[in-house]
Regions:
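ASCE P-loop NTPase helicase motor core
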Residues: 24, 119-122, 127-300
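Conserved nucleotide-binding/hydrolysis modules and their immediate coupling elements
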Residues: 35, 110, 221, 356-462
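Conserved pre-motif I regulatory segment
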Residues: 101-130
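Conserved helicase motor core of P-loop NTPases
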Residues: 244-410
Length: 463
């Protein structure tokens, strides 16, 4: 129980907690966890907090009758984030009538019809340097963003759109008709190792734009938020859009939720479910679950079915029928458009077993398809795979069908999905094509970072 060992274990426990999404732990919980790891008395741990605090390795904060203990880096990240948000929160004086007239013109041009909350969101966006727009699925966030984009376009402003994941950025591009990038791409990631990867865009080289709109904010953790804000010069407008009821970020900190709960910034909450969304039982039921109401399970629905089965093998047969026959027939979905989700990794209905079965069924062995065994897994050309950790050094490129490179960059992230297009035993490489046509060549040494993705855990699906 040397002091050095105790202190190292305290810092290790805080680091583990950050991997579970926490920027701090209550003192009692930290003491209990450290004591359990080291098998020593709690008093010995308690007396080391002061020394760590003096060395500025941890920060102790009183909140009500609870002491919260942060690792210093996360504490300062949160404090700096709050300061930078305040600096962006500039008020602009624009007359109501002027904004309303312009909204009316946009509605006429586009055929969109805004409700009062959406109009309020546009007004707040015009009058404030920083705005948060939040609401559940189907509440018109996209229509609101589209109106805001058109409004500022008429002002001749430069607008950047971004989202935390490749898939969210692709979706944002489709719904707005403007190019959206991942936040990492917008900030121009340079390939360091995970801890030291930096961005070319920062406080000394900020983004050259008038307005930044970030979608799917619930997935942004404190580390990425801090990097983003450093790259936004005061005077640039920032609009954050998201749904706080979605799963929080995998990384530490519930940034969106904390910004809203602080009540320090302008927030517009969209609550009305629009007509086209109110015919979607997925959206209606999501709102019911949020309100703690019973979900309607009649299987006349077009998009929400509940099939009750009790034995693992029977459940698997139902899934196989759906994926292979019923869904392709009824909704014209290819097996790659269908995602099977399960809560666990191990067991009869875990990711590992399901992937083996689904692969056998959807992409069976074939003389024309090369494969590569890796641990318990077999990768085969045509397989659907997922990247399982952030790799800032992986190079990708986007090519035309004639092989000309049109774009290239670095970084493939936890949760990115793609298809294996080529396995080359001679070069010991496997090529995977991700969203947006980004192709990456993996050396066989890196195959630990990939897994089959016919079935994935619910936790991984949040991107």
């Amino acid at each position: 129980d040397s002091d050095f060992r105790v202190r190292s274990c305290i810092l290790y426990t805080l680091l583990q907690a950050s991997g579970e999404g926490h920027t701090f732990l209550p003192q009692e919980e930290l003491t209990a966890k450290t004591s359990e790891l080291l098998g020593i008395d709690k008093d010995i741990i308690e007396k080391n907090y002061m020394d760590l605090s003096i060395e500025r390795k941890i920060i102790m904060k009183q909140s009500g009758d609870q002491t919260q203990i942060y690792s210093a880096s996360f504490y300062y990240m949160e404090a700096n984030t709050a300061t930078m948000l305040r600096e962006l929160d500039i008020a602009y004086d624009v007359a109501d009538a002027e904004i309303e007239q312009r909204i009316h013109n946009i509605e006429k041009q586009t055929g969109m019809q805004l409700d009062e909350h959406q109009v309020q969101a546009v007004k707040e966006a015009v009058r404030n340097g920083l705005l948060v727009i939040t609401g559940g699925p189907g509440t018109g966030k996209t229509t609101t963003i589209n109106t805001i984009i058109r409004y500022f376009e008429m002002e001749g402003m430069d607008i950047f759109l971004a989202a935390p994941t490749g898939r969210a950025a692709k979706r944002m591009s489709e719904t707005t008709g403007f190019e959206a990038r991942t936040i990492h791409r917008m900030l121009e990631l340079n390939g360091g190792m995970e801890g030291s990867a930096g961005f070319e865009r920062n406080e000394t080289n900020p983004l050259e734009t008038d307005l930044v709109i970030i979608d799917e904010m619930s997935m942004v953790d404190i580390t990425l938020m801090n990097s983003l804000l450093k790259a936004i010069a005061p005077g640039t407008r920032l609009i954050l859009v998201g749904d706080i009821n979605q799963l929080p970020s995998v990384g530490p900190g519930s940034v969106l939720k904390d910004i809203i709960q602080s009540e320090a910034f302008n927030v517009v909450m969209l609550t009305k479910i629009f007509r086209q969304a109110s015919t979607s039982d997925i959206i209606v039921n999501a709102h019911k679950i949020n309100r703690g109401e019973e979900v309607s399970l009649d299987n006349k629905s077009m998009d929400f079915f509940f099939l009750k089965r009790y034995e693992a093998d029977i459940i698997i047969n139902v899934v196989l029928q759906l994926v292979k026959q019923k869904l392709p027939k009824f909704v014209d979905a290819t097996p790659y458009d269908i995602q099977v989700l399960t809560p666990m990794r191990k067991g009869l209905l875990g990711v590992e077993r399901l992937n083996g079965i689904l692969q056998q069924y959807l992409n069976p062995p074939d003389k024309s398809k090369r494969e590569k065994e890796h641990g318990d897994m077999v990768f085969r050309e045509g397989d659907k795979v997922m990247q399982t950790k952030n790799n800032y050094q992986l190079k990708w490129e986007i090519c035309t069908k004639f092989g000309l490179t049109v774009d290239k960059g670095m970084g493939i992230f936890n949760g990115d999905m793609g298809i294996i297009t080529e396995i080359n035993d001679f070069a010991e490489t496997m090529t995977v094509e991700f969203d947006e046509g980004r192709k990456v060549e993996y050396s066989y040494k890196l195959l630990d970072e990939l897994e089959l993705a016919y079935a994935i855990t619910i936790h991984k699906s949040q991107g």
